[in-house]
């Protein structure tokens, strides 16, 4: 499948931060500022709008026994596709960029070629898109004895499993010079000794893009679009052209900038987490008092 993506407008937000002072309105946890919804005037708002928590639940068969594993990651909006009005029930498609090791958790037998996984030993059973946000955007806080202004990490199950739009693996035709052939042989031997199924591992970039279909007939999917994706699209459009972002500054100039990293890492933290399910035995809404994936921001200054 070939997908042409829009300009990487979200990159502009990184550089816009270099001209602003850090905001101290965040909760502090170790070296991070966490669990805060930035206002529209705060420097982290653009990145907050574009970032999402990704949760994959996979069913794995081991020694004849079925087990479930959960993998977490962070994704950010990179593109979208409006529904085709000529096609009945055609979904809105959001494209989220993420790390390749995160996207590798997606095991979808219906995925696009060449990403379709044919391993019968396991597959992704549920996918959730999450964000640290206002509880009232999705449910009444009173249901859980929470105040009206309550905030939590809200994880929402999409009605269908995502697909892989792009994975930056085996995308370069590498031919090794004579002096590197011995090194290549050692690499192949290491791969063989590591018992990996892929004996021809090639260089890759830590980057992938997931396609998230959202159906208007699904009440929960509509909430995902209204409260997660639509604000991200507005922010994306606001950022504008980033094609020439590296055109003028030299590398030495770029080293002087301050860079902010925002996301949903796996950290132990006491913050409420709300889950909205569309399928399974626990279909509906339930709350977990604590979560291990807080919304956080940190910065790096070279």
Curated annotation (Swiss-Prot):
Domain of life: Bacteria
UniProt name for this protein: Uncharacterized lipoprotein MPN_585
Topology term for the membrane: Lipid-anchor
Native source species: Mycoplasma pneumoniae (strain ATCC 29342 / M129 / Subtype 1) (Mycoplasmoides pneumoniae)
GO cellular component: a single term: plasma membrane
Signal peptide: 1-22
Lipid attachment, kind N-palmitoyl cysteine: 23
Lipid-modified sites (S-diacylglycerol cysteine): 23
Chief location: membrane
Swiss-Prot/TrEMBL keywords: Cell membrane, Lipoprotein, Membrane, Palmitate, Signal
Localization per Swiss-Prot or TrEMBL: Cell membrane
Pfam families: Mycop_pep_DUF31
InterPro entries the UniProt entry points to: Mycoplasma_peptidase_DUF31 (IPR022382), Uncharacterised_MG067 (IPR022381)
S-adenosyl-L-methionine found in the keyword field: no
Family label: Belongs to the MG067/MG068/MG395 family.
């Amino acid at each position: 499948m070939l997908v042409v993506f829009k300009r990487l407008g979200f990159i502009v937000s990184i550089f816009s931060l270099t001209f602003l002072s850090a905001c101290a309105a965040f909760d502090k946890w170790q070296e991070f500022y966490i669990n805060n919804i930035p206002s529209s005037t705060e420097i982290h708002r653009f990145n907050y709008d574009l970032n999402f928590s990704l949760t994959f639940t996979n069913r794995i068969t081991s020694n004849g026994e079925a087990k479930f594993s959960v993998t977490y990651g962070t994704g950010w909006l990179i593109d979208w596709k409006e529904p085709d009005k000529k096609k009945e029930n055609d979904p809105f498609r959001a494209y989220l960029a993420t790390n390749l090791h995160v996207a590798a958790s997606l095991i979808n037998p219906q995925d696009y070629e060449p990403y379709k996984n044919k391993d019968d030993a396991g597959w992704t059973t549920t996918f959730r898109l999450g964000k640290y946000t206002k509880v009232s955007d999705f449910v009444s806080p009173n249901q859980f004895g929470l105040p009206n202004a309550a905030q939590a990490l809200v994880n929402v199950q999409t009605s269908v499993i995502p697909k892989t739009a792009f994975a930056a693996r085996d995308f370069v035709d590498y031919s090794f010079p004579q002096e590197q052939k011995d090194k290549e042989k050692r690499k192949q031997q290491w791969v063989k000794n590591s018992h990996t199924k892929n004996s021809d591992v090639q260089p890759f970039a830590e980057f992938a893009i997931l396609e998230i279909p959202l159906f208007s007939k699904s009440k929960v999917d509509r909430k995902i679009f209204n409260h997660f994706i639509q604000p991200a699209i507005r922010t994306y459009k606001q950022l504008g052209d980033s094609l020439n972002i590296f055109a003028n500054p030299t590398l030495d100039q770029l080293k002087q900038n301050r860079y902010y990293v925002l996301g949903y890492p796996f950290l132990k933290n006491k913050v409420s987490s709300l889950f909205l399910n569309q399928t399974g035995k626990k279909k509906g809404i339930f709350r977990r008092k604590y979560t291990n994936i807080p919304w956080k921001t940190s910065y790096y200054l070279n």
